[in-house]
């Protein structure tokens, strides 16, 4: 066989590996560009995701962890039209419903990973596929992680097998301000738009600490110190405040001009009214202005407790909110401060010590952050490996907390993977809980999900079976997962 057909067959298999489970996303309507304005957020890359049609499903007799702190034994969950219709005992199965006997098994909301780089650093880890850090400037709020996502990353499939239904894909942490993040549904697709969570706010990835000063200090430019880090954030948001004032002034002048123009036919109208000239558009400052308006949610990479406190002061100075600190190895030192400010912390169970700012980690970190009233502790992956077993990572953190004397039953720990990240994404009205009206993102586990032997038996996204361990996926696995022992090289 010639070399070219082999290459074409490989490409075809890879493409087939990511076809949607049923149907095609609706074609977007022809775009109608709106006038730019500082008062409106803009997303020209709209979601084309559409939930696949699915039959009614009744899950019977499971142990249900609702995601909001409640455990329900011997309970049924009814899924209808992609949503959770009812939760209770002895629920009636509609005609034609798929009835699942879940006695002895556990049900949870779909896992939400609030810190993932799947798609922007896909497997295999090649330079040609490494698109997560735009290391040409320390301030790059103009770049969007979604424009680097490769939907065929096999990591999405292995994450799904671990019960992950929603992910926030972020840029890397080499820059002070790394760019916009995006929330995606973990569905098979050939475009990122078909994965994009409809209506989800974007995030802004920011990073404090060692990474930016190492990247740019090694080039002999700012920042090269922690004080250079802080100066960089402050200047960026000072510029954004000025930019926003310019656009607010233009909006006022445009409204006044329109008022005069509309009255031109009357005796009081100004027939010679001149339209105002808009400021020059700046994609970097567009993003930061949207942060100042609260339209983009700040997700901040930060390890040390003292640096988290400093960044909260910077946010207060410029009037924006940091939704969550990520990695947050020393969050236990400022747990009360974070709770009082309503700021979440996304953490690892026990990853620490790999650089100076990560030295003071403790395995009770998540449990301690979870303890104060009003807290918002979360567990994240930041890894194509860890995302496959987030339930086990949470079990480690839960175990360390219990050993330290804290009361952390499964119904409390599951919040770290479900409702808390949903809140941090502004999506807790849609996902993160087993409650009537919520999207039917549901996982059926073969046992207590915090057991080392736990496996996700079935995973539902919007009521559709996205993964079924008993019935291997119909799509062919990717070339990366299979290997290519017979591949021929091109000359």
Describe the residue ranges of each PLM region.
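Polyanionic/metal-chelating signatures
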Residues: 155, 160-326, 455, 461, ...
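His/Asp/Glu-enriched, well-ordered alpha-helical/loop segment
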Residues: 48, 53, 123-124, 130-136, ...
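Divalent metal-coordination and catalytic microenvironments
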Residues: 62, 77, 82, 104, ...
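Histidine-rich, glycine-flanked metal-binding segment
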Residues: 41-55, 64, 68-108, 125
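N-terminal pre-domain segments of enzymes
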Residues: 19-54, 484-487
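C-terminal motif of bacterial Sec signal peptides marking the signal peptidase cleavage site
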Residues: 14-15
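C-terminal cap of metal-dependent C-N hydrolases
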Residues: 62, 423, 435-479
């Amino acid at each position: 066989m010639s070399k070219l057909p082999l290459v074409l067959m490989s490409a075809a298999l890879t493409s087939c590996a990511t076809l949607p489970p049923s149907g095609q996303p609706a074609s977007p309507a022809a775009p109608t560009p709106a006038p730019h304005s500082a008062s409106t957020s803009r997303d020209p890359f709209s979601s084309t995701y559409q939930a696949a049609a699915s039959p009614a499903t009744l899950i019977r007799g499971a142990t249900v962890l609702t995601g909001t702190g409640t455990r329900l034994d011997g309970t049924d969950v009814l899924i209808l039209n992609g949503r959770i219709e009812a939760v209770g005992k002895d629920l009636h199965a509609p005609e034609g419903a798929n009835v699942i006997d879940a006695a002895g098994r556990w049900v949870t909301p779909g896992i939400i990973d609030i810190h993932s780089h799947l798609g922007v650093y896909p497997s295999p880890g090649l330079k040609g596929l490494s698109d997560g850090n735009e290391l040409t400037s320390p301030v790059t709020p103009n770049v969007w992680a979604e424009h680097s996502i490769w939907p065929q990353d096999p990591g999405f499939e292995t994450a799904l097998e671990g019960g992950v239904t929603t992910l926030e894909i972020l840029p890397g942490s080499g820059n002070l301000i790394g760019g916009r993040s995006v929330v995606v549904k973990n569905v098979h697709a050939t475009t990122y738009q078909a994965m994009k969570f409809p209506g989800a706010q974007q995030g802004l990835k920011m990073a404090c600490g060692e990474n930016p000063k190492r990247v740019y200090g090694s080039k002999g430019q700012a920042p090269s110190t922690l004080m250079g880090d802080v100066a960089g954030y402050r200047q960026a948001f000072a510029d954004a405040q000025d930019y926003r004032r310019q656009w607010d002034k233009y909006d006022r002048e445009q409204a006044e001009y329109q008022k005069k123009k509309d009255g031109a036919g009357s005796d009081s109208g100004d027939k010679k009214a001149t339209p105002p000239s808009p400021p020059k558009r700046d994609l970097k400052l567009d993003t930061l202005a949207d942060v100042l308006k609260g339209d983009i949610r700040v997700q901040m990479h930060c390890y040390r407790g003292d640096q988290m406190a400093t960044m909260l002061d910077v946010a207060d100075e410029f009037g924006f909110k940091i939704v969550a600190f990520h990695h947050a190895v020393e969050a236990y030192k400022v747990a009360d401060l974070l709770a009082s400010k309503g700021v979440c912390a996304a953490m690892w169970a026990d990853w620490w010590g790999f650089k100076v700012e990560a030295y003071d980690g403790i395995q009770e970190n998540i449990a301690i952050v979870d303890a104060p009233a009003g807290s918002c502790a979360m567990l994240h992956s930041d890894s194509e490996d860890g995302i496959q077993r987030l339930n086990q990572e949470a079990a480690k953190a839960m175990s360390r907390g219990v050993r330290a004397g804290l009361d952390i039953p499964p119904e409390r720990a599951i919040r770290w993977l479900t409702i808390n990240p949903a809140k941090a994404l502004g999506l807790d009205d849609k996902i993160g809980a087993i409650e009537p009206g919520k999207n039917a993102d549901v996982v059926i586990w073969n046992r207590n999900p915090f057991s080392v032997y736990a496996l996700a038996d079935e995973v539902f996204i919007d009521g559709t079976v996205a993964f079924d361990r008993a019935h291997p996926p119909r799509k062919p696995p990717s070339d990366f997962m299979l290997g290519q022992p017979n591949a021929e090289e091109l000359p």
